[in-house]
From Swiss-Prot:
This protein's record includes keyword RNA-binding: yes
Keyword Ribosomal protein set for record: yes
Stored Pfam families: Ribosomal_L9_C, Ribosomal_L9_N
InterPro entries: Ribosomal_bL9, Ribosomal_bL9/RNase_H1_N, Ribosomal_bL9_bac/chp, Ribosomal_bL9_C, Ribosomal_bL9_C_sf, Ribosomal_bL9_N, Ribosomal_bL9_N_sf
Source lineage: Bacteria, Pseudomonadati, Pseudomonadota, Alphaproteobacteria, Hyphomicrobiales
Originating gene: rplI
SUPFAM superfamilies, per database record: L9 N-domain-like, Ribosomal protein L9 C-domain
Protein name (Swiss-Prot/TrEMBL): Large ribosomal subunit protein bL9
Keywords: Ribonucleoprotein, Ribosomal protein, RNA-binding, rRNA-binding
Annotated segments matching region Disordered: 149-191
Length: 191
């Protein structure tokens, strides 16, 4: 099906372009969301008459997204979750959790604007991409930790999954030569 795009859509085209898409994509997403019109003579003339208002609305949305992006730029958000000794979370941090965290800080972001291919399942520093507008994209850092104190240590660059961080033991002291006597022949019954 040929459609006229009413806004820029990633991997599809710019506003005003006539593109060919699958029927289901057009019927189930583009047309109901108001992102496109069927490409026929009546809709082409309708689009040309409304083009100025659509471009103005697009510029307004883009400027709003840029102000939010400037406010979010360089920010790090702490996520406290329970986790095992190895840093594996008992659960995960998904896109809806990212939306809740940003909402608590006063940023109104939709779940569809968060690009998180797989949920976060380990503690550590994770970068999450936000698509605020088709032309405005940024990354925020999530500091996933077991406590606020651990998040602070982690933000300074300390690894919380090492043996020292978990058990308070120096990893260098856990070398095999410390456990075995290289001089012994292996027979303990020589008495």
């Amino acid at each position: 099906m040929d459609v006229i795009l009413l806004e820029r859509i990633n991997k599809l085209g710019q506003m005003g372009e006539t593109v060919k898409v699958r029927d289901g994509y057009a019927r189930n997403f583009l047309l109901p969301q108001g992102k496109a019109l069927r490409a026929n003579a009546a809709n082409k003339t309708r689009f040309e008459t409304e083009r100025a208002t659509l471009e103005a609305r697009n510029l307004e949305r883009k400027s709003e997204a840029q102000t939010v992006a400037e406010a979010l730029a360089g920010k790090s958000f702490i996520v406290v979750r329970s986790a095992g000794e190895t840093g594996q979370l008992y659960g995960s941090v998904a896109a809806r959790d990212v939306v809740e965290i940003l909402g608590a800080e006063g940023f109104n972001i939709g779940r569809n604007q968060v690009e998180l291919n797989t949920p976060i399942k380990t503690i550590g520093l994770h970068n999450v991409t936000l698509h605020l507008h088709a032309e405005v994209e940024l990354q925020v850092e999530l500091n996933v930790a077991r406590s606020a104190e651990e998040a602070e240590r982690q933000s300074k660059g300390e690894s919380l999954t090492s043996a020292d961080a978990i058990y308070g033991v120096d990893e260098d002291a856990l070398r095999p030569e410390d456990f075995f006597d290289p001089e012994a022949d292996g027979n303990e019954d020589d008495e």
